[in-house]
Regions:
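Hydrophobic anchor at the beta1->P-loop junction of P-loop NTPases
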Residues: 7
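The conserved Walker
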Residues: 11
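Conserved glycine(s) of the Walker
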Residues: 14
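Conserved Walker
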Residues: 17
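Conserved substrate/cofactor phosphate-moiety recognition/catalytic segment
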Residues: 20, 24-67
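Glycine-rich phosphate-binding loop used to anchor ATP phosphates in small-molecule kinases
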Residues: 59-108, 112-116
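A glycine- and Lys/Arg-enriched "phosphate-lid" helix/loop adjacent to the NTP-binding pocket
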Residues: 110-156
Length: 191
């Protein structure tokens, strides 16, 4: 296993659930990049790392991904984990495969993606409702907002899957049999 691992993909695909399981079973420290990005938005708005840029959801994803990839590489390069028995387990939505390939050292940091693109937006909306909890920011959104979000999550899932295929990166569909898919990933990591 690599010193560091990124679990990336769309919201409610199982990233945080998988990261919690990985952190319990392997020598990794779970880092949620949602919190880091929220910090950038609030304290350093001049960086352009913001989910509220007035852009389409797809364009916002691309902008944040392109800006966060070198930040992640700087975290890896810092050497803070080199002397530890554990590495970083980075849980992240806004990192496209093309930015991982172009800006992050794969010798030191592996990646896998979780998506929900083999569904219609309506099916994706129902998945969101199934897995939302009061701890999730989406839990408090209206059904209308969630249905709009489901459309872009399906589109982003398909973009991520296409880029993963192009670059030979692991991508897992979690729209159906999510628990089994996540368990299969854990088994692969154990080998």
């Amino acid at each position: 296993m690599k010193k560091h691992l990124i679990v990336a993909g769309v919201p409610r695909a199982g990233k945080s659930t998988l990261c919690a399981q990985i952190a319990r079973n392997f020598p990794y420290q779970h880092i949620s990049m949602d919190s880091v990005i929220a910090g950038f938005e609030r304290c350093f708005p001049d960086t352009g790392v913001s989910t509220y840029q007035g852009l389409s959801s797809m364009d916002t994803l691309k902008v944040i991904s392109h800006k966060m990839a070198p930040f992640l590489q700087a975290m890896i390069d810092s050497g803070e984990y080199d002397e530890q028995d554990y590495g970083m387990l980075i849980d992240m939505y806004q990192l496209l495969p093309e930015d991982y390939v172009n800006q992050i050292d794969p010798e030191r940091c592996a990646i896998l993606y979780l998506v929900t693109g083999n569904v219609t937006p309506e099916e994706r909306f129902l998945i969101q409702k199934q897995y939302d909890t009061p701890k999730d920011y989406t839990y408090y959104k209206t059904d209308e907002e969630l249905k709009e979000g489901a459309q872009y999550i399906v589109e982003q899932s398909r973009l991520i899957r296409e880029q993963c295929e192009r670059h030979g990166l692991p991508c897992f569909e979690t729209a159906f049999d999510r628990g089994q898919v996540l368990e299969g990933i854990l088994q692969k990591l154990s080998m």
